[in-house]
Structure formats: structure tokens, C-alpha cells
Amino acid sequence: MVLGCPGESRISPERIAGYTAAMKKYGVPLVEKPEEMIGKVDAMLIEAVDGSVHYERAKPFLEAGLPCFVDKPFACSVVDARKMIDLAAKKNVSIFSSSALRYATEVTQYFADRKHGKVLGCLTYGPASTHDRNPGLFHYGIHAVEILYTFMGPGCERVSCVHDEGADVATGHWKDGRVATVRGNRSGPSAFGFTAFAEKGIHTTAVSSRFFYRELLKKVVEMFKTGKPPLDPSVTLEIVAFIEAANRSGANHGSPEAVKA
């Protein structure tokens, strides 16, 4: 990291001072406006917790031809997500977004084992606190949704979601007939985990938080070096569409909603 900008936050403004002090402690120069970094950096990390501002934050850097990692949630609408992806394609630069849970040890080890066969369905869970700036599952529930998509891949057609004060429970139906469910908890334990239903067995495990952010950063650095994102942006776009559909369903008493990416 060679340059940074504290910026502003409408979700966690109280954290800016601490992060600014930490950057200064480690000798990272800071600028007042993000655009001042253009011409002085090779790539950008958009780290605002507020997904609704990611397009406006990423836009000047994508237009300048800089590859971008956009932290979760990539966007809080399909419209904004598509704008970023289309702009990156137009400028021929890489763009990448993911929850670190995609790279948790228990998740990657499942696929490294190569003994389970095709995933037929999945149940994932995790904490799902909410914030008006990141509605519904966009705020913290996106972590469990990312695990779900790591197992199921893209292709979800519709979602039904039951929403109450304690949880969001969203069930997706895939084009090939598979079904998967994500549970975002706002009461009880705040653990992450999954149950994968595969051709050769059922595997259930909790997911540790010890190493996943380190593993995500390895993927970010790899993209900046190679220019190739580790995850196709179309998958990220569908994750945004899945959450949009789940939020609509939850607000409409669980009615099925189409996933429109």
C-alpha cells in the first residue's frame, strides 16, 4: 500500500480517525480526495463498507484504467453492479469483489478434497446484522450468500425469503433443479458454517475466521499482478441480483422473486 484516502463514511464514521492514525503510523501517505491518487498508484482497493457508494467511488479509477478490488457488498443494486462491470470491460481493466468467506479454509478444503462429487444442494449460515445503507442481506448476510454461491455456482432463477427480527432465510432455485438455502442470523450464535449435499455424501462444518481475509488478499494481489480476476464478475453480479430478489421477497411475505442479473 503506497497511498490512501480516509474519505467519509455514513455507516462507521467513528472508525475513520483510528484507521487514519494507523495508516500514518505505518508510513502510508494520505490525500484529501481519492482522485488525487490517480497517476500515483497502479491499482485501487475500494474499502467503503457502504455498498451504495461503491460505483461512484470506483468510477474515476476505472475510467483511468486502474484495476479495482471492491470490497463487499460489491453494490446494493444490480444497476450499480452492472455499471461497474460494464465500465471495467469498456476500459479493459480487471475488477473483482468477494466476501473473504469464499476463501475460508473449510470451504477451499472441501473442493480440494475432490471426493464429494457434484454439489446437489447446500445450506449456509452466518450472522446478518442489517443497516439502512446496505439493506437486508447486503450488509453482513452477504458473507453466507458468498459461501452459498461458492458451492452452487451461478444459475439461480428465483428466490423466496422469510424475514423476521431474528433472521432472514432465503431459498434459491437453480436452473438445473438444485435448491439451496442461506440463513442469516440476528439472534443466537454468530458463527459461519455450511452443509453441502453432494453425490457422494453430506458434509457439515463450521467455518473459522482465522485465515480467510489473508487468503482473500492473496487473490487481490494475484489479480493486480496478472490482470485476471479470480472470480468472473458475472458471478458477483448474480450474487447482487440474488440478494436484491431475497430482499424483495422478504418484504413481500416470502413471495417468489426472479433473480434478474
Segments (PLM) and residue ranges:
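N-terminal glycine-/serine-/threonine-rich beta1-alpha1-beta2 phosphate-ribose binding loop
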Residues: 1-64, 86-91, 252, 259
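A general structural signal for well-ordered alpha-helical segments in protein cores
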Residues: 16, 107, 144-145, 213, ...
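Rossmann-like dinucleotide-binding domain that binds NAD(P)(H)
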Residues: 122-190, 234-241
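Interdomain hinge/lid region at the active-site interface
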Residues: 188-228
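C-terminal helix-rich "cap/oligomerization" subdomain common to oxidoreductases
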Residues: 36, 41-48, 223-261
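A contiguous active-site-proximal alpha/beta segment in oxidoreductase catalytic domains
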Residues: 69, 74-134
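Aromatic/hydrophobic pocket-lining residues that form π-stacking "cages" and hydrophobic walls in ligand
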Residues: 57, 84, 110, 245-246
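Short loop/edge segments at beta-strand edges and connector loops
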Residues: 32, 70, 97-99, 160-163
